[in-house]
Regions:
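Conserved catalytic core of nucleotide-sugar-dependent glycosyltransferases
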Residues: 145-160
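N-terminal nucleotide-binding beta1-loop-alpha1 segment
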Residues: 1-20, 214
């Protein structure tokens, strides 16, 4: 299994912190956000390569960081240098798949996710389902729902509807940027883009997939911390206590 980490964004709301430095490498609780994610996932021993998809502006920072890690990490530079010319998350996935000629099961995630629970629970869930999967959490705030990807599910966690930032959200379940795609599904990214699948939001591909292939959304067993702007970053630094292990 390959793990693709989406890290080509420019995090403009965190300027000046991220004006010349990538958000996934900001430190929280003595470790970078990426260190928290990778150190946890690597304990399972099922991921044989981590692929960090970066823009050109920040690629050298990720290269320097990768050199300090023991696991196999490949940094893919998508060639963009400004927020206005970014490829978008789905095109970045396709770019990395094409560049590295990947033909593997894919675990795809945003590189700025900070969790208080182990990702291994989601990896086990996805491997048992052997189907496209994401995670979800309950969001009571209507205003936050308007800015989020929304999933509706049945009693078996099967996704019945998935939408992105719509004015009439169909449920209170927010999809987070963690996805599992078996290799036969990962091959469909190019087809999805040609079919008009949105390219910017990372969940756009799964929204396309779930209308064609049974897909699942696991309820998160803990909390995801949002690092969206300076204020939230400062708050997370005060609150975050690391990953709880069972």
């Amino acid at each position: 299994m390959k793990c693709l980490i989406l890290a080509a964004g420019y995090a403009t709301r965190l300027y000046p912190l991220t004006e010349n430095f990538p958000k996934p490498l900001l430190e929280v609780g003595g470790k970078t956000i990426l260190d928290w994610l990778l150190d946890d996932m690597d304990t399972m021993g099922v991921i044989d390569e981590y692929v960090v998809i970066s823009n050109h502006k920040y690629a050298h920072h990720f290269e320097s960081w990768a050199a300090t890690k023991k696991m196999k990490i490949t940094v893919v530079d998508d060639g963009t240098s400004t927020n206005e010319t970014r490829l978008g998350a789905v095109r970045d996935i396709q770019f990395a798949v094409d560049q590295l000629r990947l033909e593997d099961d894919l675990l795809v995630m945003a590189g700025d996710n900070l969790l208080d629970f182990s990702m291994t629970s989601f990896i086990r869930y996805a491997m048992e389902k052997n189907a496209p999967c994401t995670m979800r959490y309950y969001e009571p705030s209507f205003q936050k729902l308007l800015k989020s990807g929304i999933v509706s599910v049945d009693e078996q966690d099967t996704i019945t509807l998935m939408t992105e930032k719509v004015p009439d959200p169909a449920s209170n379940w927010v999809s987070v940027a963690f996805y599992y795609y078996p290799k036969d599904v990962a091959k469909l990214i190019g087809q999805a883009l040609a079919d008009g699948c949105g390219a910017d939001a990372p969940g756009s591909f799964l929204a396309w997939v779930c209308r064609r292939i049974p897909s699942y959304a696991m309820e998160m067993p803990g909390k995801r911390y949002d690092v969206g702007d300076i204020a939230s970053y400062e708050q997370v630094q005060k609150e975050y206590r690391g990953i709880e292990t069972c």
